[in-house]
Amino acid sequence: MIKCTRRIEFDAGHRIIGHQNKCQFLHGHRYVLEIAIAANKTDKLGMVIDFGLIKDVAKKWIDENFDHSLILHQDDKEMGQQIENCTGQKIYYMQNNPTAENIATHLKNEIFPKLFVGQNFFVSNLKLYETPNCFVEV
């Protein structure tokens, strides 16, 4: 198997409902996403995927949905609506707490498979850095 990885950076805020520490409060991160696309063999040009295609597809989705947004649990809609009404802030709701683990799993299992359809490659894994020292991999 051959993998090509593209790094995408974005800024977003979130909070973790029910967390007993400071992550229960609204705060933000400079996220770094590494998306690995894999195939069993290269195409006729000798590539798994053009790195530009990863950028065009994945980064476009990230920019439209996550970048400079507030990522919240769907149970946080009341707060999200108040923030959106007061500031115009873009809000993205998830079905579960927006932990790094859940965000990465959501992207890998629900979002990116719909974006990279009908190709001879697949999203093999994602790394999502919440800080320079802390990341999850799915």
From Swiss-Prot:
It comes from the Bacteria. GO terms for biological process: queuosine biosynthetic process. Zn(2+) binds at residues 14, 27, 29. Its EC number is 4.1.2.50. Keywords: Lyase, Metal-binding, Queuosine biosynthesis, Zinc. Pfam families: PTPS. Its cofactor is Zn(2+). It catalyses: 7,8-dihydroneopterin 3'-triphosphate + H2O = 6-carboxy-5,6,7,8-tetrahydropterin + triphosphate + acetaldehyde + 2 H(+). The active site is at residues 23, 68, 130. One of its GO terms (molecular function) is metal ion binding. Pathway: Purine metabolism; 7-cyano-7-deazaguanine biosynthesis. It is an enzyme of class 4 (lyase). Binds 1 zinc ion per subunit. Belongs to the PTPS family. QueD subfamily. Catalyzes the conversion of 7,8-dihydroneopterin triphosphate (H2NTP) to 6-carboxy-5,6,7,8-tetrahydropterin (CPH4) and acetaldehyde. The active site is at the interface between 2 subunits. The proton acceptor Cys is on one subunit, and the charge relay system is on the other subunit. This is 6-carboxy-5,6,7,8-tetrahydropterin synthase. The lineage of its organism: Bacteria, Pseudomonadati, Pseudomonadota, Alphaproteobacteria, Rickettsiales. The gene is queD.
